[in-house]
Amino acid sequence: MTDQHAFATEQVQLDPTLSPTTEETTHFGFKTVAKSEKQKMVANVFHSVAGKYDLMNDLLSFGIHRVWKRFTIDCSGVRKGHKVLDLAGGTGDFTAKFSRLVGPSGEVILADINDSMLRVGREKLRNLGVVGNVNYVQANAEALPFPDNTFDCVIISFGLRNVTDKDKALRSMFRVLKPGGRLLVLEFSKPILDPLSKIYNFYSFNILPKIGEVVVNDSESYRYLAESIRMHPAQDVLKQMMIDAGFEQVNYYNLSAGIVALHRGYKF
């Protein structure tokens, strides 16, 4: 945690005072809050941005998120007849793609803890004609409401950093995977090139909130986005967390020089 704080203050020229967390507290961006409050605070962020979430994804990533997602699908091994959990699936980009891959004999469940995001995703997919093999569930990643050994693939995309207890969530994902199934975690991570880190930090803390203010009239939600990325575990730390949760053959791919990383692990 100290290293992350030093990295943020040195590169971004901010001075957040990070208090150590306890069993009752966690981080909401750079703030230390009660665990019982974080879920509500994250919910408010996504209630605010749900309506223009897809537009902001395109604007903030310059459309590159589509390339990251295509690579993730290529690594998924999903095929006809599979059952897929798109966790923290939001507006359903992955659900739409996986629906076609699994076909009528398979199933995709779009799950999100936030009802606003789930509502936007359901409407979007129905307008695209994605029906028949897709179901929707409001669910907390830390306590998934599915039986053991249910899914061939679980994916969580740009959602794990918002989870209060990441270790508990990873164990929950492991439980619902079938033996032989795989977990894919696509998430913002730590750039591996120092010059890129400096540019990325400037963009994240100076430009990104201003775009949020102009497009959705909400700069604070996008300031939280930047802070939550800095507080998310680095690539090797998340890899070890997945191993500790029971996953095997865990590896990761740095995308866009580590701005995003895709972690993959198997349940055997």
From Swiss-Prot:
<keyword id="KW-0489">Methyltransferase</keyword>
<feature type="binding site">
    <location>
        <position position="91"/>
    </location>
    <ligand>
        <name>S-adenosyl-L-methionine</name>
    </ligand>
</feature>
<feature type="binding site">
    <location>
        <position position="112"/>
    </location>
    <ligand>
        <name>S-adenosyl-L-methionine</name>
    </ligand>
</feature>
<comment type="similarity">
    <text>Belongs to the class I-like SAM-binding methyltransferase superfamily. MenG/UbiE family.</text>
</comment>
<dbReference type="InterPro" id="IPR029063">
    <property type="entry name" value="SAM-dependent_MTases_sf"/>
</dbReference>
<keyword id="KW-0831">Ubiquinone biosynthesis</keyword>
<feature type="binding site">
    <location>
        <position position="157"/>
    </location>
    <ligand>
        <name>S-adenosyl-L-methionine</name>
    </ligand>
</feature>
<comment type="pathway">
    <text>Cofactor biosynthesis; ubiquinone biosynthesis.</text>
</comment>
<dbReference type="GO" id="GO:0008425">
    <property type="term" value="F:2-methoxy-6-polyprenyl-1,4-benzoquinol methyltransferase activity"/>
</dbReference>
<dbReference type="GO" id="GO:0009234">
    <property type="term" value="P:menaquinone biosynthetic process"/>
</dbReference>
<dbReference type="GO" id="GO:0043770">
    <property type="term" value="F:demethylmenaquinone methyltransferase activity"/>
</dbReference>
<keyword id="KW-0949">S-adenosyl-L-methionine</keyword>
<feature type="compositionally biased region" description="Polar residues">
    <location>
        <begin position="10"/>
        <end position="23"/>
    </location>
</feature>
<feature type="binding site">
    <location>
        <begin position="140"/>
        <end position="141"/>
    </location>
    <ligand>
        <name>S-adenosyl-L-methionine</name>
    </ligand>
</feature>
<dbReference type="InterPro" id="IPR023576">
    <property type="entry name" value="UbiE/COQ5_MeTrFase_CS"/>
</dbReference>
<comment type="pathway">
    <text>Quinol/quinone metabolism; menaquinone biosynthesis; menaquinol from 1,4-dihydroxy-2-naphthoate: step 2/2.</text>
</comment>
<dbReference type="GO" id="GO:0032259">
    <property type="term" value="P:methylation"/>
</dbReference>
<comment type="function">
    <text>Methyltransferase required for the conversion of demethylmenaquinol (DMKH2) to menaquinol (MKH2) and the conversion of 2-polyprenyl-6-methoxy-1,4-benzoquinol (DDMQH2) to 2-polyprenyl-3-methyl-6-methoxy-1,4-benzoquinol (DMQH2).</text>
</comment>
<dbReference type="Pfam" id="PF01209">
    <property type="entry name" value="Ubie_methyltran"/>
</dbReference>
<dbReference type="GO" id="GO:0009060">
    <property type="term" value="P:aerobic respiration"/>
</dbReference>
<feature type="region of interest" description="Disordered">
    <location>
        <begin position="1"/>
        <end position="23"/>
    </location>
</feature>
<protein>
    <recommendedName>
        <fullName>Ubiquinone/menaquinone biosynthesis C-methyltransferase UbiE</fullName>
        <ecNumber>2.1.1.163</ecNumber>
        <ecNumber>2.1.1.201</ecNumber>
    </recommendedName>
</protein>
<keyword id="KW-0808">Transferase</keyword>
<keyword id="KW-0474">Menaquinone biosynthesis</keyword>
<dbReference type="InterPro" id="IPR004033">
    <property type="entry name" value="UbiE/COQ5_MeTrFase"/>
</dbReference>
